[in-house]
Amino acid sequence: MDNYSLLSTPRPRISSSALSAFPDIMSSLATSLPDLGDTQNGEQLRRNCTIYRPWFSPYSYFVCTDKESHLEAYGFPEVDREEGRGDNCLLEDVAESVCSSSSSQENTYPREANRKSKHGLDSITSQDILMASKWHPAQQNGYKCASCCRMYPTLHSLKSHIKGGFKEGFSCKVYYRKLKTLWGKEQKARTGDRISLGSCQAFK
């Protein structure tokens, strides 16, 4: 029997000219992770920062929790974009509702109307979750999320998943917000049709 020795292959070295030819690669590597050396509390960030990989994603993300236990995800801009889209949609709906009201109400109470409508759309209740599950087949083992189709044993666990879904790398709350906005528009359209029908019958 011959003795085989393990061959160690040397790693390829990147020359300075190659690095200067591809500055985008180095800039992306430099901006992908936060620089812990520049911060004053570098040790604390090293303790509170972890690398997180969701089960559905092939990518890993650098996640940090600060002193107030707020979650910050580096390298995952989709969450912020989705949240931003949801907030923009809410602001557009609020603007439409304010514009549809009378001019006197716009001049006197625009901020209060914005706050009330935004708070109503932002809070997802158990009734909203049950209403969204009507379009899905009835589940015997628990409750199914209408956004990500995951099963949860109790309604409380599903509600907590919707509220804190951004910690898992995505947000089902945006989906339920949009559903609630659509339901509000449908309800307004139905009430408007009823009022128009009532006025037509009165004229007849």
Curated annotation (Swiss-Prot):
Keywords: Differentiation, Membrane, Nucleus, Spermatogenesis
GO (cellular component) term, any one: nuclear membrane
Membrane-spanning intervals of the chain: none
Tissue: Testis-specific.
Keyword Nucleus: yes
Disruption phenotype: Deficient mice develop and grow normally. Knockout males, but not females, exhibit subfertile capacity. Deficient mice are characterized by abnormal sperm head shape and a failure of sperm-egg fusion.
Its biological purpose: Plays a role in spermiogenesis and fertilization.
Protein's name in the database: Spermatogenesis-associated protein 46
Organism: Mus musculus
Phylogenetic classification of the source organism: Eukaryota, Metazoa, Chordata, Craniata, Vertebrata
